[in-house]
């Protein structure tokens, strides 16, 4: 691919030599030829980028969609840990109550000794 010759600053700062009847026609024509080449390069570049975008969009539509939400068959490990720790805590509380009911009198009797 051809390279771009002028920047916007180059075009803005371009000066032409003066002749009796105005600017040098040859200089202006050469400059405009180069500007035209730049515009053709830009057009080619834009066309290739648009084609690349279209190709990427098509490729994206062909790929299966991946959901960002976790699937029900694979629960979130943090949720599982939190719910199991709550379950363990509840079990420990119940076990403590049962021990107090069953062994409470024995514990009180042993403290009197």
Swiss-Prot record:
Gene Ontology BP, a term: cell division
Physiological role: Divisome component that associates with the complex late in its assembly, after the Z-ring is formed, and is dependent on DivIC and PBP2B for its recruitment to the divisome. Together with EzrA, is a key component of the system that regulates PBP1 localization during cell cycle progression. Its main role could be the removal of PBP1 from the cell pole after pole maturation is completed. Also contributes to the recruitment of PBP1 to the division complex. Not essential for septum formation.
Keyword Cell division: yes
Keyword field: Cell cycle, Cell division, Cell shape, Coiled coil, Cytoplasm
Assigned protein family: Belongs to the GpsB family.
Bilayer-spanning residue ranges: none
Superkingdom of the source species: Bacteria
Any coiled-coil regions, as ranges: 37-63
Protein name: Cell cycle protein GpsB
UniProt keyword annotation of Cytoplasm present: yes
A Pfam family annotated for this UniProt entry: DivIVA
GO cellular component: cytoplasm
Compartments, record wording: Cytoplasm
Principal location class: cytoplasm
Oligomer and partners: Forms polymers through the coiled coil domains. Interacts with PBP1, MreC and EzrA.
Spans annotated as Disordered: 61-82
Gene (name only): gpsB
